[in-house]
């Protein structure tokens, strides 16, 4: 099943989206920061539509990665800048929907004045990276 490669992939900092965009996930002591980047993604439509599509795609993958890595506490998401309030609301709604099935209490607090998404997720167990580090220590 290639479990080792899947576990290694789940710890990588950069996650590629199907569209060619990326998520960069940086857990630190105080919070986790997730940065959404365009990378290779270039839409054929207007820039604003391209940004919206990439941010919407990122919402689903962010929810998947947060659950997979069991991230908790304060999570800040730096979406690609959106000009229109309608697009910002669509992305917040998509993020709410992506976390709706999460069994761990997750609250999307909204956007800051800098356009960062603030969210919190209750800690239910240690993050994946912590569990794997402890497992490595016991095998040494």
Task: Please provide the spans of the model-predicted regions.
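A contiguous, basic/glycine-rich beta-loop/short-helix subdomain that forms a polymer-engagement track
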Residues: 1-23
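Conserved glycine-centered short motifs in functionally critical loops
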Residues: 17-140
């Amino acid at each position: 099943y290639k479990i080792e490669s899947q576990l290694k992939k789940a710890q990588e900092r950069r996650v590629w989206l199907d569209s060619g965009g990326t998520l960069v996930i940086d857990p630190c002591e105080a919070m986790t920061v997730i940065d959404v980047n365009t990378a290779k993604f270039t839409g054929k439509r207007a820039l604003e539509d391209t940004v919206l599509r990439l941010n919407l795609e990122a919402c689903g993958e962010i929810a998947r990665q947060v659950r997979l890595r069991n991230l908790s506490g304060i999570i800040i998401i730096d979406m690609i800048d959106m000009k229109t309030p309608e697009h910002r609301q669509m992305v917040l709604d998509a993020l709410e929907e992506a976390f709706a099935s999460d069994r761990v209490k997750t609250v999307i607090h909204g956007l800051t004045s800098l356009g960062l998404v603030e969210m919190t997720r209750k800690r239910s167990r240690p993050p994946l990276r912590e569990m794997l580090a402890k497992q490595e220590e016991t095998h040494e």
